[in-house]
Curated annotation (Swiss-Prot):
The chain crosses the membrane at residues 311-327. InterPro entries: Mps2. This is Monopolar spindle protein 2. Interacts with BBP1, MPS3, and SPC24. The gene is MPS2. Its main location: nucleus. It comes from Saccharomyces cerevisiae (strain FostersB) (Baker's yeast).
Amino acid sequence: MSNGAFDAIFEYAWGQIDKPISGDFIYGKDLPKLIEIIENIFQKAQKSGSYELRLPLFSEINKDLFRTFSNTKTFFKIHKEEFDDIFFNLVNHPLREILENAFIGVDSIPSDFIVSMNLNSPSKFLVENKNKNTEGAGISTPRKKLTESPIKLLSRKNIGKALEVQVEELKRELTAKQSLLQENERQVSELKIRLETYQEKYASIQQRFSDLQKARQVEDNQNSSRTSDPGSPLVTGIDQKAILEEFRRRLQRQTDTISFLKDQIRRERGLNCSNDKVSHSKRKHATTDGDGTFKNFISAVPSNIWVKATIRIIVCFALLAGVLPYIRKYVYAHDTPSQNSRLQLSWWENSGILSKIVWFFEDQTDLETEYRSNANVDDAYSRVFGI
Protein backbone atom coordinates (compact mmCIF):
# COMPACT_ATOMS: atom_id res chain seq x y z
CA MET A 1 0.00 0.00 0.00
CA SER A 2 1.28 3.39 -0.83
CA ASN A 3 1.29 6.08 1.79
CA GLY A 4 -0.99 8.11 -0.49
CA ALA A 5 -4.03 5.90 0.10
CA PHE A 6 -3.78 6.14 3.89
CA ASP A 7 -3.03 9.85 3.73
CA ALA A 8 -6.05 10.39 1.47
CA ILE A 9 -8.37 8.61 3.93
CA PHE A 10 -6.91 10.48 6.90
CA GLU A 11 -7.00 13.86 5.17
CA TYR A 12 -10.59 13.30 4.14
CA ALA A 13 -11.69 12.52 7.69
CA TRP A 14 -9.60 15.32 9.14
CA GLY A 15 -11.04 17.81 6.70
CA GLN A 16 -14.57 16.96 7.84
CA ILE A 17 -13.74 18.31 11.33
CA ASP A 18 -10.94 20.83 10.97
CA LYS A 19 -11.96 24.33 9.85
CA PRO A 20 -9.75 26.86 8.10
CA ILE A 21 -10.00 29.17 11.07
CA SER A 22 -8.89 26.43 13.52
CA GLY A 23 -5.24 26.55 12.64
CA ASP A 24 -4.56 22.91 11.54
CA PHE A 25 -5.67 21.17 14.75
CA ILE A 26 -8.70 19.61 16.33
CA TYR A 27 -9.79 19.49 19.98
CA GLY A 28 -9.77 16.42 22.13
CA LYS A 29 -13.58 16.37 22.17
CA ASP A 30 -13.50 15.79 18.34
CA LEU A 31 -11.41 12.58 18.45
CA PRO A 32 -14.44 10.17 18.64
CA LYS A 33 -16.01 12.00 15.71
CA LEU A 34 -12.83 11.61 13.61
CA ILE A 35 -12.73 7.87 14.31
CA GLU A 36 -16.44 7.59 13.45
CA ILE A 37 -15.88 9.25 10.02
CA ILE A 38 -13.09 6.80 9.16
CA GLU A 39 -15.24 3.84 10.25
CA ASN A 40 -18.19 5.09 8.16
CA ILE A 41 -15.98 5.09 5.03
CA PHE A 42 -15.20 1.40 5.51
CA GLN A 43 -18.81 0.51 6.32
CA LYS A 44 -19.93 2.22 3.10
CA ALA A 45 -17.34 0.24 1.11
CA GLN A 46 -18.58 -3.02 2.65
CA LYS A 47 -22.19 -2.21 1.77
CA SER A 48 -21.24 -1.64 -1.88
CA GLY A 49 -19.90 -5.21 -1.98
CA SER A 50 -16.69 -4.28 -3.69
CA TYR A 51 -14.37 -5.34 -0.81
CA GLU A 52 -14.38 -7.86 1.98
CA LEU A 53 -13.60 -6.03 5.23
CA ARG A 54 -13.13 -6.90 8.91
CA LEU A 55 -15.53 -4.68 10.74
CA PRO A 56 -15.80 -3.00 13.08
CA LEU A 57 -12.41 -1.38 12.93
CA PHE A 58 -12.36 -0.45 16.62
CA SER A 59 -13.55 -2.45 19.60
CA GLU A 60 -15.84 -1.08 22.25
CA ILE A 61 -12.91 -0.81 24.64
CA ASN A 62 -11.07 1.40 22.20
CA LYS A 63 -14.17 3.51 21.68
CA ASP A 64 -14.49 3.92 25.45
CA LEU A 65 -10.90 5.12 25.55
CA PHE A 66 -11.67 7.69 22.84
CA ARG A 67 -14.71 8.93 24.74
CA THR A 68 -12.78 9.13 28.01
CA PHE A 69 -10.07 11.14 26.33
CA SER A 70 -12.62 13.51 24.84
CA ASN A 71 -14.27 14.01 28.24
CA THR A 72 -11.07 14.56 30.18
CA LYS A 73 -9.20 16.53 27.52
CA THR A 74 -12.08 18.40 25.96
CA PHE A 75 -10.16 21.42 24.73
CA PHE A 76 -6.81 19.76 24.30
CA LYS A 77 -5.38 20.74 20.92
CA ILE A 78 -4.43 17.77 18.73
CA HIS A 79 -2.25 18.82 15.85
CA LYS A 80 -2.01 16.65 12.76
CA GLU A 81 1.64 15.86 13.35
CA GLU A 82 0.85 14.73 16.92
CA PHE A 83 -2.09 12.49 16.05
CA ASP A 84 -0.12 9.28 15.42
CA ASP A 85 1.53 9.38 18.84
CA ILE A 86 -1.67 10.26 20.66
CA PHE A 87 -3.59 7.48 18.90
CA PHE A 88 -0.86 4.90 19.55
CA ASN A 89 -0.71 5.76 23.28
CA LEU A 90 -4.46 5.27 23.55
CA VAL A 91 -4.95 1.88 21.76
CA ASN A 92 -1.34 0.64 21.54
CA HIS A 93 -1.64 0.27 17.75
CA PRO A 94 -1.06 2.81 14.93
CA LEU A 95 -4.04 3.86 12.83
CA ARG A 96 -2.29 2.82 9.60
CA GLU A 97 -1.95 -0.78 10.82
CA ILE A 98 -5.62 -0.97 11.81
CA LEU A 99 -6.80 0.23 8.39
CA GLU A 100 -4.49 -2.16 6.51
CA ASN A 101 -5.65 -5.16 8.56
CA ALA A 102 -9.28 -4.34 7.74
CA PHE A 103 -8.95 -5.75 4.16
CA ILE A 104 -9.27 -9.52 3.81
CA GLY A 105 -6.92 -11.23 1.34
CA VAL A 106 -4.62 -8.26 0.86
CA ASP A 107 -1.91 -6.70 3.03
CA SER A 108 -2.61 -3.08 2.11
CA ILE A 109 -5.30 -0.71 1.06
CA PRO A 110 -6.09 -1.23 -2.66
CA SER A 111 -5.38 1.74 -4.87
CA ASP A 112 -8.83 1.64 -6.46
CA PHE A 113 -10.42 1.91 -2.99
CA ILE A 114 -9.86 5.64 -2.99
CA VAL A 115 -11.36 6.02 -6.48
CA SER A 116 -14.38 3.89 -5.69
CA MET A 117 -15.09 5.88 -2.55
CA ASN A 118 -14.55 9.15 -4.42
CA LEU A 119 -11.68 10.13 -2.17
CA ASN A 120 -9.37 11.33 -5.03
CA SER A 121 -10.38 15.01 -4.75
CA PRO A 122 -8.03 16.67 -2.35
CA SER A 123 -9.49 18.23 0.68
CA LYS A 124 -9.29 21.84 1.37
CA PHE A 125 -6.31 21.25 3.57
CA LEU A 126 -4.42 19.52 0.79
CA VAL A 127 -5.16 22.44 -1.51
CA GLU A 128 -4.04 24.95 1.08
CA ASN A 129 -0.89 23.00 1.76
CA LYS A 130 -0.19 22.69 -1.96
CA ASN A 131 -0.63 26.43 -2.47
CA LYS A 132 1.70 27.13 0.38
CA ASN A 133 4.28 24.72 -1.00
CA THR A 134 4.19 26.44 -4.46
CA GLU A 135 5.02 29.77 -2.91
CA GLY A 136 8.45 28.59 -1.95
CA ALA A 137 10.25 26.03 0.07
CA GLY A 138 11.51 28.62 2.51
CA ILE A 139 8.16 30.19 3.12
CA SER A 140 6.40 27.24 4.62
CA THR A 141 8.16 24.92 7.07
CA PRO A 142 6.47 21.83 8.42
CA ARG A 143 5.63 21.78 12.08
CA LYS A 144 8.06 19.94 14.21
CA LYS A 145 6.60 16.63 15.17
CA LEU A 146 6.27 16.27 18.87
CA THR A 147 7.51 13.09 20.44
CA GLU A 148 5.44 13.44 23.57
CA SER A 149 2.21 11.51 23.78
CA PRO A 150 -1.04 13.00 25.13
CA ILE A 151 -0.76 10.69 28.14
CA LYS A 152 2.60 12.21 28.84
CA LEU A 153 1.15 15.66 28.32
CA LEU A 154 -1.76 14.73 30.58
CA SER A 155 0.58 13.37 33.18
CA ARG A 156 2.68 16.51 32.82
CA LYS A 157 -0.40 18.63 33.38
CA ASN A 158 -1.39 16.51 36.34
CA ILE A 159 2.11 16.81 37.65
CA GLY A 160 1.88 20.55 37.17
CA LYS A 161 -1.34 20.66 39.16
CA ALA A 162 0.18 18.44 41.81
CA LEU A 163 3.18 20.71 41.93
CA GLU A 164 0.91 23.72 42.31
CA VAL A 165 -0.86 21.99 45.19
CA GLN A 166 2.48 21.13 46.73
CA VAL A 167 3.61 24.71 46.30
CA GLU A 168 0.49 25.94 48.08
CA GLU A 169 1.02 23.43 50.86
CA LEU A 170 4.65 24.43 51.13
CA LYS A 171 3.62 28.08 51.29
CA ARG A 172 1.18 27.34 54.08
CA GLU A 173 3.79 25.25 55.85
CA LEU A 174 6.31 28.04 55.39
CA THR A 175 3.85 30.54 56.85
CA ALA A 176 3.20 28.25 59.83
CA LYS A 177 6.92 27.76 60.35
CA GLN A 178 7.50 31.49 60.13
CA SER A 179 4.82 32.02 62.79
CA LEU A 180 6.39 29.29 64.90
CA LEU A 181 9.81 30.85 64.38
CA GLN A 182 8.49 34.23 65.48
CA GLU A 183 6.94 32.61 68.55
CA ASN A 184 10.22 30.88 69.31
CA GLU A 185 12.08 34.14 68.92
CA ARG A 186 9.65 35.79 71.32
CA GLN A 187 10.15 32.97 73.83
CA VAL A 188 13.91 33.24 73.40
CA SER A 189 13.70 36.96 74.14
CA GLU A 190 11.64 36.29 77.26
CA LEU A 191 14.09 33.61 78.36
CA LYS A 192 16.99 35.99 77.84
CA ILE A 193 15.25 38.60 79.99
CA ARG A 194 14.56 36.01 82.69
CA LEU A 195 18.16 34.81 82.48
CA GLU A 196 19.43 38.34 82.97
CA THR A 197 17.09 38.76 85.95
CA TYR A 198 18.31 35.52 87.49
CA GLN A 199 21.91 36.50 86.89
CA GLU A 200 21.32 39.79 88.68
CA LYS A 201 19.63 37.99 91.58
CA TYR A 202 22.47 35.49 91.74
CA ALA A 203 25.03 38.28 91.80
CA SER A 204 23.08 40.04 94.57
CA ILE A 205 22.78 36.84 96.63
CA GLN A 206 26.46 36.09 96.11
CA GLN A 207 27.35 39.59 97.28
CA ARG A 208 25.17 39.21 100.37
CA PHE A 209 26.73 35.84 101.09
CA SER A 210 30.20 37.36 100.84
CA ASP A 211 29.18 40.17 103.20
CA LEU A 212 27.69 37.71 105.68
CA GLN A 213 30.79 35.54 105.47
CA LYS A 214 33.00 38.52 106.18
CA ALA A 215 30.79 39.59 109.08
CA ARG A 216 30.90 36.02 110.44
CA GLN A 217 34.68 36.00 110.25
CA VAL A 218 34.84 39.33 112.08
CA GLU A 219 32.45 38.03 114.75
CA ASP A 220 34.46 34.82 115.13
CA ASN A 221 37.64 36.84 115.55
CA GLN A 222 35.98 38.99 118.20
CA ASN A 223 34.67 35.92 120.03
CA SER A 224 38.07 34.25 119.90
CA SER A 225 39.65 37.38 121.38
CA ARG A 226 37.14 37.35 124.27
CA THR A 227 37.58 33.65 125.11
CA SER A 228 40.33 34.53 127.65
CA ASP A 229 37.80 36.51 129.72
CA PRO A 230 35.96 34.19 132.17
CA GLY A 231 32.77 36.19 131.83
CA SER A 232 32.80 36.16 128.02
CA PRO A 233 29.94 34.27 126.32
CA LEU A 234 30.55 30.92 124.64
CA VAL A 235 31.19 30.75 120.93
CA THR A 236 27.90 30.59 119.08
CA GLY A 237 29.21 27.87 116.83
CA ILE A 238 29.16 25.19 119.56
CA ASP A 239 26.93 22.33 118.76
CA GLN A 240 23.82 22.48 120.94
CA LYS A 241 23.29 18.74 120.75
CA ALA A 242 26.76 18.07 122.14
CA ILE A 243 26.09 20.45 125.04
CA LEU A 244 22.80 18.79 125.89
CA GLU A 245 24.38 15.35 125.67
CA GLU A 246 27.17 16.41 128.02
CA PHE A 247 24.63 17.84 130.49
CA ARG A 248 22.64 14.60 130.40
CA ARG A 249 25.77 12.55 130.98
CA ARG A 250 26.82 14.67 133.97
CA LEU A 251 23.33 14.64 135.43
CA GLN A 252 23.18 10.85 135.12
CA ARG A 253 26.56 10.55 136.82
CA GLN A 254 25.42 12.82 139.66
CA THR A 255 22.17 10.86 139.98
CA ASP A 256 24.10 7.60 140.22
CA THR A 257 26.39 9.13 142.88
CA ILE A 258 23.43 10.36 144.90
CA SER A 259 21.75 6.96 144.69
CA PHE A 260 24.96 5.29 145.84
CA LEU A 261 25.32 7.70 148.79
CA LYS A 262 21.70 7.21 149.77
CA ASP A 263 22.13 3.44 149.72
CA GLN A 264 25.25 3.78 151.84
CA ILE A 265 23.41 6.00 154.33
CA ARG A 266 20.57 3.50 154.54
CA ARG A 267 23.01 0.69 155.18
CA GLU A 268 24.73 2.74 157.91
CA ARG A 269 21.37 3.49 159.49
CA GLY A 270 20.48 -0.16 159.44
CA LEU A 271 23.80 -1.06 161.10
CA ASN A 272 23.33 1.56 163.82
CA CYS A 273 19.82 0.40 164.49
CA SER A 274 21.05 -3.19 164.77
CA ASN A 275 23.80 -2.07 167.16
CA ASP A 276 21.26 -0.20 169.25
CA LYS A 277 19.10 -3.26 169.36
CA VAL A 278 22.08 -5.39 170.48
CA SER A 279 23.04 -2.92 173.23
CA HIS A 280 19.46 -2.59 174.23
CA SER A 281 19.16 -6.38 174.51
CA LYS A 282 22.30 -6.47 176.66
CA ARG A 283 20.87 -3.88 178.96
CA LYS A 284 17.69 -5.86 179.32
CA HIS A 285 19.61 -8.59 181.18
CA ALA A 286 20.34 -6.10 183.97
CA THR A 287 16.73 -5.13 184.48
CA THR A 288 14.00 -6.84 186.44
CA ASP A 289 10.80 -8.43 185.33
CA GLY A 290 8.87 -5.27 186.26
CA ASP A 291 10.27 -3.50 183.19
CA GLY A 292 7.69 -5.20 180.93
CA THR A 293 4.91 -3.04 182.31
CA PHE A 294 6.99 0.12 181.67
CA LYS A 295 7.76 -0.97 178.08
CA ASN A 296 4.09 -1.50 177.34
CA PHE A 297 3.31 1.93 178.77
CA ILE A 298 5.99 3.63 176.63
CA SER A 299 4.86 1.91 173.42
CA ALA A 300 1.32 3.18 174.00
CA VAL A 301 2.55 6.79 173.90
CA PRO A 302 2.18 8.61 170.53
CA SER A 303 5.11 8.37 168.08
CA ASN A 304 5.91 12.06 168.14
CA ILE A 305 9.36 12.48 169.71
CA TRP A 306 8.66 15.60 171.68
CA VAL A 307 5.42 14.28 173.09
CA LYS A 308 7.11 11.06 174.04
CA ALA A 309 9.97 12.91 175.68
CA THR A 310 7.64 15.07 177.76
CA ILE A 311 5.61 12.11 178.89
CA ARG A 312 8.75 10.18 179.67
CA ILE A 313 10.12 13.04 181.82
CA ILE A 314 6.89 13.24 183.80
CA VAL A 315 6.85 9.48 184.29
CA CYS A 316 10.49 9.50 185.35
CA PHE A 317 9.92 12.18 187.99
CA ALA A 318 6.93 10.25 189.31
CA LEU A 319 8.94 7.06 189.51
CA LEU A 320 11.87 8.81 191.17
CA ALA A 321 9.61 10.30 193.78
CA GLY A 322 8.04 6.91 194.45
CA VAL A 323 11.12 4.72 194.52
CA LEU A 324 13.62 7.13 196.11
CA PRO A 325 13.13 5.72 199.67
CA TYR A 326 13.63 2.21 198.39
CA ILE A 327 16.77 3.28 196.58
CA ARG A 328 18.35 4.63 199.70
CA LYS A 329 17.51 1.52 201.60
CA TYR A 330 18.79 -0.66 198.82
CA VAL A 331 22.05 1.27 198.52
CA TYR A 332 22.90 1.19 202.17
CA ALA A 333 21.74 -2.37 202.64
CA HIS A 334 24.04 -4.00 200.05
CA ASP A 335 27.71 -4.30 200.46
CA THR A 336 30.21 -2.71 198.15
CA PRO A 337 31.25 -5.03 195.35
CA SER A 338 34.57 -6.72 195.70
CA GLN A 339 37.59 -5.39 193.95
CA ASN A 340 38.05 -8.72 192.23
CA SER A 341 34.87 -8.26 190.25
CA ARG A 342 35.49 -7.52 186.60
CA LEU A 343 32.35 -5.40 186.17
CA GLN A 344 32.50 -2.15 188.12
CA LEU A 345 29.02 -0.57 188.02
CA SER A 346 27.95 2.86 189.12
CA TRP A 347 25.54 3.23 191.98
CA TRP A 348 22.63 3.91 189.62
CA GLU A 349 23.52 0.96 187.39
CA ASN A 350 22.93 -1.37 190.32
CA SER A 351 19.27 -0.32 190.29
CA GLY A 352 17.22 -1.80 187.49
CA ILE A 353 14.76 1.09 187.29
CA LEU A 354 17.36 3.88 187.33
CA SER A 355 19.57 2.15 184.81
CA LYS A 356 16.58 1.64 182.51
CA ILE A 357 15.64 5.35 182.69
CA VAL A 358 19.20 6.55 182.08
CA TRP A 359 19.84 4.18 179.23
CA PHE A 360 16.50 5.15 177.58
CA PHE A 361 17.42 8.85 177.47
CA GLU A 362 20.92 8.06 176.19
CA ASP A 363 19.47 5.96 173.35
CA GLN A 364 17.04 8.70 172.36
CA THR A 365 19.82 11.28 172.32
CA ASP A 366 22.04 9.07 170.17
CA LEU A 367 19.23 8.40 167.65
CA GLU A 368 18.32 12.10 167.34
CA THR A 369 21.97 13.04 166.85
CA GLU A 370 22.42 10.38 164.18
CA TYR A 371 19.20 11.42 162.42
CA ARG A 372 20.22 15.09 162.37
CA SER A 373 23.64 14.13 161.01
CA ASN A 374 22.15 12.02 158.22
CA ALA A 375 19.62 14.74 157.35
CA ASN A 376 22.42 17.30 157.12
CA VAL A 377 24.36 15.01 154.81
CA ASP A 378 21.32 14.55 152.53
CA ASP A 379 20.70 18.30 152.42
CA ALA A 380 24.33 18.95 151.58
CA TYR A 381 24.31 16.50 148.65
CA SER A 382 21.00 17.89 147.41
CA ARG A 383 22.37 21.43 147.41
CA VAL A 384 25.57 20.37 145.68
CA PHE A 385 23.86 18.47 142.86
CA GLY A 386 20.83 20.76 142.54
CA ILE A 387 18.21 18.19 143.51
